[in-house]
């Protein structure tokens, strides 16, 4: 992050794209993750985390998982992008929204550290049964990248601790 923090520019090529990502892409992607855009297929990404948290907390789900087996990675990539944006342009509102998503992710984590909404909500009996196509490692890797970026840019380590729990789970499993 020091390299990003030390990177200075004013306008030009990089300035244009940094502003576009900060002002358009990150807010739009957040609205997509929250299913707030009419006329397009719903992402259900954050809703899947809500369902997983509900299942962890109550043992039941009031809805169904929707999306691809790798749906969680969309949330991870948004958090990572937001973290890099926060590093260059502190934004209290964006940081608070990220913190809220991180709280939800923590609630969706199983007691043994496992974190993947597809398997928690839809088919827990199939965890780790298809390493090639199951995308558990893929989603974990993206969320670990987000956790590191968020800790580096904000100094907050909650997501990092959550993902250390998942890394410990993977280590014990394999």
Task: Show the residue positions of the predicted features.
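Glycan-recognition and catalytic cores of secretory/periplasmic carbohydrate-active enzymes
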Residues: 1-174
